[in-house]
Curated annotation (Swiss-Prot):
Record organism: Pyrodictium occultum
Known role: General factor that plays a role in the activation of archaeal genes transcribed by RNA polymerase. Binds specifically to the TATA box promoter element which lies close to the position of transcription initiation.
Name this protein carries in UniProt: TATA-box-binding protein
Metal-binding keyword on record: no
Gene3D superfamilies in the cross-refs: TATA-Binding Protein (3.30.310.10)
Source superkingdom: Archaea
A GO MF term: DNA binding
One of the GO BP terms on file: DNA-templated transcription initiation
Length: 199
């Protein structure tokens, strides 16, 4: 007895393109709750840069994870370049370990606070920015000044730069999850407003 297998048709929901997002940069402040002798750090760790006449902080670059830390006498650090929270924490631990290894005493545990996450995203559809600007609250679109629509989202509290190609830049997130939440939320809003179409 012959059996025929008919190919299953994909539902419209399965065929619908899904938005994607990538974390590009995490900026965080770190507090060591103690003062640091930057001259001693410069003498101990040869790879750092310290030129107090030009800038009051010491520049410490890591290759893996690829981050840059600005270290100040106050024991505060600004860390940039991490592509994930995990990389950020790993970088801070590595810096503190290296300082200790070179005889710099660190007494407490570093307190890390994310200040800003910058991400890129692609809705994988084209956006009618004119329509979106008219119907999307907290938005500004002035194409003669800037080609993208600026949307300030209340929850999560982020700013999205949306381009007609469906590409976006997201700033202001404090947690990685907020980036993905914002991308999905704006996609659903634009879809509901009929401001998206296949490219």
């Amino acid at each position: 007895m012959e059996s025929f297998v008919t190919p299953q048709r994909r539902s419209a929901a399965e065929q619908e393109p899904k938005p994607t997002a990538n974390i590009e940069n995490i900026v965080a402040t770190v507090s060591l709750d103690q003062t640091l002798d930057l001259n001693l750090i410069e003498r101990s760790i040869l790879t750092v840069e310290y030129n107090p006449e030009q800038f009051p902080g010491l520049v410490y670059r890591l290759d893996s994870p690829k981050v840059t830390a600005l270290i100040f006498k106050s024991g505060k650090m600004v860390v940039t370049g991490a592509k994930s929270t995990r990389d950020l924490i790993e970088a801070v631990k590595k810096i503190v370990r290296n300082l200790k290894k070179h005889g710099i005493q660190i007494y407490g545990r570093p307190k890390v606070q994310i200040q800003n996450i910058v991400a890129s995203a692609n809705l994988n559809v084209c956006v009618d920015l004119e329509r979106a600007a008219l119907t999307l609250e907290n938005s500004m679109y002035e194409p003669e000044q800037f080609p993208g629509l600026i949307h300030r989202m209340d929850e999560p509290r982020v700013v999205l730069l949306i381009f007609s190609s469906g590409k976006m830049v997201i700033t202001g997130a404090k947690r990685e999850e907020e980036v993905y939440e914002a991308v999905n939320k704006i996609y659903e809003k634009l879809k509901k407003l009929r401001a998206i179409r296949p490219c």
